[in-house]
Design a protein with these regions (language model features):
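Substrate-binding clefts and catalytic carboxylate motifs of secreted carbohydrate-active enzymes
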Residues: 4-11, 15-232
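Short, surface-exposed recognition loops and adjoining beta-strand edges that mediate ligand/DNA contacts
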Residues: 1
């Protein structure tokens, strides 16, 4: 709200903490804000010193909507969507001199009571105890790390009540072979390290999801199990 205070534009460079889609506005506002600030101040180097949203690895949603930051439901899938879209905008705006994900690890924050974790800021890509790397961690790994990898997102969303779902995979390989319950389902290509396959039909009971890729003559794979229990 204070973007255009004159004193902010005295230095040669400036960075902002911006939380579009969390504390203010919507996720898709981020790109427009970058365009606006660069148009107004083309000679000032602009950075983003913080961006991120909270996620509890036990909270999940097929169609995540923007949560209440101070509420108790912080689905991992919304954090995934947020970082996918923000990183896409960061790549699209080369005038940014620096950006920083907020934050690497969940951390103590005494005044908070949100995301089912009292006293914790849950914007980390890794849980506070360092034991669980959230899905968004692997999104950035697919984008930033050259070591071949395949990772099925929403893997902790194990208990399903809807048969029709999407499988989304993060990988730095060129194509992914998707198998569902041992049967070849499809081969997916992607140019942005996010591989999607919609309208997957789960069967009642346990469903094995297997994603496989080839790179440099080697095979890389990941798997998870989703259990479907249809409402009676």
């Amino acid at each position: 709200m204070f973007d255009d205070r004159p004193q902010h534009w005295m230095p040669d460079v400036i960075s902002w903490n911006k939380y579009f889609g969390w504390y203010v506005g919507a996720i898709d506002d981020f790109g427009g804000w970058l365009d606006m600030m660069h148009k107004k101040h083309p000679d000032t180097r602009i950075g983003v010193s913080e961006y991120g949203v909270g996620a509890n690895t036990q909270d999940h949603s097929l169609n995540p909507r923007q949560p209440n930051p101070g509420g108790q439901f912080h689905p991992e899938e919304y954090q995934n969507l947020y970082h996918e879209k923000h990183w896409r905008e960061i790549e699209r705006h080369p005038f940014l001199y620096a950006t920083a994900v907020w934050v690497a690890f969940d951390f103590s924050s005494d005044g908070r009571n949100e995301g089912k974790n009292p006293g914790v800021n849950d914007k980390g890509l890794v849980t506070q105890d360092r034991k669980i790397k959230k899905d968004a961690y692997y999104f950035y790994k697919a984008n930033w790390n050259s070591a071949p990898m395949v990772y099925i997102s929403s893997r902790r969303f194990t208990q399903r009540t809807e048969a029709n779902c999407e499988v989304k995979i993060y990988s730095n390989c060129e194509s992914i072979a998707l198998l569902v319950n041992g049967k070849n389902y499809t081969t997916i290509d992607s140019s942005d390290h996010v591989f999607r396959c919609a309208d997957i039909m789960l069967q009642p009971g346990a469903n094995t999801i297997l994603a496989t890729a080839r790179k440099n003559g080697q095979t890389f794979s990941d798997s998870c199990t989703w259990n479907l229990s249809l409402p009676k």
